[in-house]
Amino acid sequence: MANDNHNTVYAFSDGSAIGNPGPGGYGAVLKYGENVKEFSQGFKHTTNNRMELLGAISALGALKGRQRVVLTTDSQYVINGIEKGWAKKWQANSWMRNRKEKALNPDMWQRLLDVCARHDVSFEWIRGHTGHPENERCDELANGAARASSSEQIVDEEFMKLNG
């Protein structure tokens, strides 16, 4: 990570689900110069991909005004959905992957598309669990939130609507 551009916000995110689906959580870290902010939240029943998406959404959604952002994640699902245009294609096709298959997590993809449109975002993929400090911190936050007591976790309403 190069901190040579003082006008760039560096965002990091990760998601986790135990059992997949099962209890889950996301973790996110924002860095702007010397300022660091962390976010996490646990959910009673969700999937790892929903939490990966929500980590990115939470990081980008916390930013005020239009920002230049480099978002680093170990989720190829998140990166490919945006960078390969999958999410926009699914959106244009009423959230269908093809004639027969619905796209998964349309609510989260819509939210991610919306927050990306508010900023100038570039994505960087890193391999998880390789000692990258911010990715490791996001992993700790996500897993901590997934393992938190159920009284600290919230319900993933859309997941429950879609999956009963």
Which residue stretches match the model-derived regions?
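Structured nucleic-acid-interacting core domains from mobile-element enzymes and related host factors
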Residues: A2-A11
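Structured, active/binding-site neighborhoods that engage oxygen-rich ligands
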Residues: N3, N35-V36, N80
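Short, glycine/acidic-enriched capping/hinge loops at junctions between secondary-structure elements
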Residues: G22-G24, F39-S40
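Short beta-strand scaffold segments in enzyme catalytic cores
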Residues: Y26-L30
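Generic beta-structure capping elements
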Residues: K31-G33, D74
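A short, polar/acidic, helix/strand-boundary loop motif
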Residues: E34-E52
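Acidic two-metal-ion nuclease catalytic site recognized across multiple nuclease folds
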Residues: R147-G164
